[in-house]
Amino acid sequence: GATYSGKLMIVKDPSRLFVGTVPEFTNGNGMVVADIAKRYDAIGGVNGGEFVDGETTYTAMPIGLVMKDGEILNDNGGTSHVTGITFDNKLVLGNMNAAKAKELNIRDCVSISNHIGPFLIVNGEAQDIVGIAGGTNPRTAIGQTADGKILLLAVDGRQPNSIGATFSDLQDIMAQYGAVNA
């Protein structure tokens, strides 16, 4: 786009998608995405979920629900804005608690509690994102196409050559690549 540059990874086999984490969620034990990808011998990765920015640069303290391989790694006890993948490799989006995530057979998920980003497309329908603040910023999005491919998008921002993307930009990109959920 005119205001941003980014990278889109298309994962043809959704069973290869997983949540990678730091070894333990404790203040000061965070890692950058590249180091987490190396830890899991992954060929790519994106930031996901919401975390506390404490007094250190890498805090590793998630705020909401985090699940890996069906196990709850972190739970704030409330309802979170969840993005997850089920054991049958379907992308699931919704506001839910840990019990609901288990009921939906979610294998891996991350969440945000402060609703810092909207769901862009749900069941093939572009969501109304008018009035959602945010402007142009670095952005990360995930989507799934009707045939199951996973779309992982990372847009650079706050740089001279890429000030960032809006939520509307992300919605357009996901739709362009055939996302039915994003």
Language-model features: locations:
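Zymogen propeptides
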Residues: G1-G77, H81-V82, K90-V92
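Domain-core and long-helix interface of multi-subunit machines
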Residues: S113-G117, I121-G178
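A short, polar/proline- and glycine-enriched secondary-structure boundary/capping micro-motif
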Residues: N29-M31, K102-D108, N161-S168
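Structural recognition of the beta-strand scaffold that forms the well-ordered cores
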Residues: I43-N47, G84, V92, G143, ...
